[in-house]
Amino acid sequence: MNQTLIICSTLNVNSQQKSKAKNSMKNTFHSNELSSIEQRQKYQKHLKKDKKTAEDITGVGNCSPPWRLISSVLFVVCLLLMAVAMVMTIFTTRLSSERSSSNIHQEGLHHPCPENWVWFRCSCYYFSKEKLVWRESQRACLSFNSSLIRMNKEEMDFFSLKSFFWVGVYYDETSKQWLWDDHSVLPSGMFSGLESSPKNFCASYKSKEAYLAENCSTKLMYICKK
């Protein structure tokens, strides 16, 4: 009888253990299944979130058509090109001006004029410090391989002097007119303020507004040109 009870007890225990094991397996399987479902739900939520983000980005892009971006880029490029063109123009102008100034400076430094002569417009000029009568002034210029200046309008505009100088103009009593010292007629309008004068009168020059008819025996400084 006791053995029968022991066997029954053992069977009951085994049965309970098996039942617990089954329940444990069921719970574990159920737990795993729930965990798998939760992971799927999280993954689906993540996909939906990514999809929504992508849609948002696409939506923003749709609000700004590609041609607007292209036009903005082209506008910036045009501004840059204009700036570069302006800089190049300024640089070229400045370089040209510097070269021109350099050429003028070099031309002044390397002019072919003798010492104490002035270079202007491809000619050399000598302004004397000594005073001579008109005929002696003429001979002095000839000794320098030059002549008393026969002025043109450009020289009259350029030379504005502090004193009166002899120039190559004299009054010819025979023809009753003022002539260059080579006996040629003055151009129209040159020294037009000089009036008819008696014999032995020559022209002295200070500026285009100041020139005189003076006795050729007067001693003045003189201007030579070659």
Curated annotation (Swiss-Prot):
Membrane topology field: Single-pass type II membrane protein
> What spans does the record annotate as topological domain Extracellular, numbered to this chain?
94-226
What this chain does, per the entry, is described as: Lectin-like receptor for natural killer (NK) cells. Can either inhibit or activate NK cell cytotoxic activity, depending on its binding partner. Heterodimer formation with KLRI1 mediates NK cell inhibition whereas heterodimer formation with KLRI2 mediates NK cell activation. Plays a role in allogeneic recognition by the immune system.
Q: What is this protein called?
A: Killer cell lectin-like receptor subfamily E member 1
Q: What lineage does the source organism belong to?
A: Eukaryota, Metazoa, Chordata, Craniata, Vertebrata
Q: Which GO terms describe its cellular component?
A: cell surface; external side of plasma membrane; plasma membrane
Question: What sections of the sequence does the record tag as coiled-coil?
Answer: none
Coding gene? Klre1
One of the entry's Gene Ontology molecular-function terms is: transmembrane signaling receptor activity
Superkingdom, natural source: Eukaryota
The intrachain disulfides are: 113-124, 141-224, 202-216
Query: Where is the protein found, in the record's own terms?
Result: Cell membrane
Record InterPro entries? C-type_lectin-like, C-type_lectin-like/link_sf, CTDL_fold, NKG2/CD94_NK_receptors, NKR-like_CTLD
Per UniProt, the keywords (alphabetical) are:
Cell membrane, Disulfide bond, Glycoprotein, Lectin, Membrane, Receptor, Signal-anchor, Transmembrane, Transmembrane helix
Extract one GO BP annotation from the record: natural killer cell mediated cytotoxicity
Q: Which residues are glycosylated?
A: 145
Q: Give start and end of each C-type lectin domain.
A: 120-225
